[in-house]
Amino acid sequence: MSTVQVPKLNTKDLLTLEELTKEEIISLIEFAIYLKKNKQEPLLQGKILGLIFDKHSTRTRVSFEAGMVQLGGHGMFLSGKEMQMGRGETVSDTAKVLSQYIDGIMIRTFSHADVEELAKESSIPVINGLTDDHHPCQALADLMTIYEEINTFKGIKLAYVGDGNNVCHSLLLASAKVGMHMTVATPIGYEPNEKIVKKALAIAEETGAEIEILHNPELAVSEADFIYTDVWMSMGQEGEEEKYTLFQPYQINKELVKHAKQTYRFLHCLPAHREEEVTGEIIDGPKSIVFEQAGNRLHAQKALLVSLFKNVEELS
């Protein structure tokens, strides 16, 4: 660890990327790249991370559990349905009890307000592994992937096409923080949350970022360096069949990507539904870096875990 310093973060928790400065984000990315090359650094020897899941997961659960093992610690799976919190115990009581047993909490749930309360009432770090409003760990890995490809955020255009969901929200805040140009194209009625857009625009004024919310996918991807999409049906929305027709013009396909730079790269947070939000030709083609992106969840989260745990140690 002599060549790379553990980033010092001015926060106990990570609930949204709004809580981090541009400098902290860059430091986390550089630290994540270091950990990617040095997988078995035992920086969290003996530490226990509680993993609370109210939603199904592949990447989030496996990457956090594997990350804790590689860092010398342990990830403890906790099903939200099986905990007393699922039977009426308050979030506040749960936070205080878990703070007596373990060293940190990662939670993947529905209500962002519950995660905020969990963080407020706990004395240990709390990481938002996904809520209906935000997915900061995914956005941090996305920034790492972009940084590895181009080594800068200045002058980079990221185009997000599809549903203005939690992933889109976190990408808006992330892009605003690091000074990127981000365009979002959604059907009318599926725009990202207005309050989050306003926050991103306010941050962009300070950082020089450019944020655009559009309804024209061709305009959104015009001269883009990166094109990003997500599933049209998020968990719990599977019955909204009319969305398929409405979203069809927003499919990432060979015609749409002609408007981007020839050197563009394709991103997707996964899981993907081929021939819906993206064609197999694109996601399985040479421009796609979705599996490198998925792999970076592990490394970005390890950097975050070490930084948050070390900060709490120094403060205690």
From Swiss-Prot:
L-ornithine binds at N166, D230, S234, M235. Its EC number is 2.1.3.3. One of its GO terms (molecular function) is ornithine carbamoyltransferase activity. GO terms for cellular component: cytoplasm. One of its GO terms (biological process) is L-arginine biosynthetic process. SUPFAM superfamilies: Aspartate/ornithine carbamoyltransferase (SSF53671). It is found in: Cytoplasm. Pathway: Amino-acid biosynthesis; L-arginine biosynthesis; L-arginine from L-ornithine and carbamoyl phosphate: step 1/3. It catalyses: carbamoyl phosphate + L-ornithine = L-citrulline + phosphate + H(+). Carbamoyl phosphate binds at S57, T58, R59, T60, Q84, R108, H135, P136, C137, Q138, C269, L270, R297. Keywords: Amino-acid biosynthesis, Arginine biosynthesis, Cytoplasm, Transferase. Reversibly catalyzes the transfer of the carbamoyl group from carbamoyl phosphate (CP) to the N(epsilon) atom of ornithine (ORN) to produce L-citrulline. PANTHER family: ORNITHINE CARBAMOYLTRANSFERASE, MITOCHONDRIAL, ORNITHINE TRANSCARBAMYLASE, MITOCHONDRIAL. Belongs to the aspartate/ornithine carbamoyltransferase superfamily. OTCase family. This is Ornithine carbamoyltransferase. It comes from Bacillus cereus (strain ATCC 10987 / NRS 248). The gene is argF.
